[in-house]
Structures are given as structure tokens and as C-alpha cells.
From Swiss-Prot:
Source organism of this protein record: Mus musculus (Mouse)
Tissue expression profile of the protein: Detected in blood plasma (at protein level). Detected in liver.
Signal peptide: 1-19
PROSITE patterns the record matches: SAA
Entries under SMART domains matching the protein: SAA
Region (Important for amyloid formation): 20-45
Biased composition (Basic and acidic residues): 91-108
GO molecular function: heparin binding
Lineage: Eukaryota, Metazoa, Chordata, Craniata, Vertebrata
Protein role: Major acute phase protein.
Gene that this sequence comes from: Saa1
GO-annotated cellular components: extracellular space; high-density lipoprotein particle
Protein's recorded name: Serum amyloid A-1 protein
Record region (Disordered): 91-122
Subcellular location as annotated: Secreted
Subunit architecture: Homohexamer; dimer of trimers. Can form amyloid fibrils after partial proteolysis; the native, undenatured protein does not form amyloid fibrils (in vitro). Apolipoprotein of the HDL complex. Binds to heparin.
Length: 122
């Protein structure tokens, strides 16, 4: 637990060095909201083969907020994938999800993963 706390603190510290503390925290909260919106949209759409698109879109939207959004997207994505892999989800699917996450966080177009026919609402 001490190691995890130290890692989170160091990650926050590194992110804060890039800008003000309150700005970083604000961006992180907004980025977490972007990730949540992508998740709820994915559940609402219930569209076959859309998982990677929503991963990329959530990370992309969060990263557009700034360093705090990037940090939040990375921690949320890594945590979600670690949790799912721990409970037996396929390793190959986890790798593909992480690639979509990195794609979005790097600022690349999330529509690269958009499945055909997904309604324009998303």
C-alpha cells in the first residue's frame, strides 16, 4: 500500500511540475469525467466491436484537457485493464485495449477504431 501511495504521489508531483497544482487537479477531474462519459456511451450504444473506439475516444477526450487529463486517463485505463485481466479476461484483448488507450491519449483520431454503422451520436 505504501508503494502504491508513493507511486500515485510521484505521478501527481511529476504532473504538477508541468503547470499549477490546481490546474492539474482540475484537468484530472475533467479527464476522469471524459472517461466516464465514454464508458456510459459504450454501454448505451451496446454496439458490436465498438469497445476499442470508446477506449480511444475516452482517452483522447481526457488528454485534450492537459497533463492532468492524460494522467487520469492513464491511471484509469491501466487500472481497468489490470482489474479485467486479473479476473480472467483475455491477455490479447487487454493488449488491444491498451493500444487503443495509447492511441487516444497520444492525440490520434479515435475514429480509427470506429466500427461501421455506429450512430453519429457517438
Amino acid at each position: 500500500m505504501k508503494l502504491l501511495t508513493s507511486l500515485v504521489f510521484c505521478s501527481l508531483l511529476l504532473g504538477v511540475c508541468h503547470g499549477g497544482f490546481f490546474s492539474f487537479v482540475h484537468e484530472a477531474f475533467q479527464g476522469a469525467g471524459d472517461m466516464w462519459r465514454a464508458y456510459t456511451d459504450m454501454k448505451e450504444a451496446n454496439w458490436k466491436n465498438s469497445d476499442k473506439y470508446f477506449h480511444a475516444r475516452g482517452n483522447y477526450d481526457a488528454a485534450q484537457r492537459g497533463p492532468g487529463g492524460v494522467w487520469a486517463a492513464e491511471k484509469i485505463s491501466d487500472g481497468r485493464e489490470a482489474f479485467q485481466e486479473f479476473f480472467g479476461r483475455g491477455h490479447e484483448d487487454t493488449i488491444a485495449d491498451q493500444e487503443a488507450n495509447r492511441h487516444g491519449r497520444s492525440g490520434k483520431d479515435p475514429n480509427y477504431y470506429r466500427p461501421p454503422g455506429l450512430p453519429d451520436k457517438y
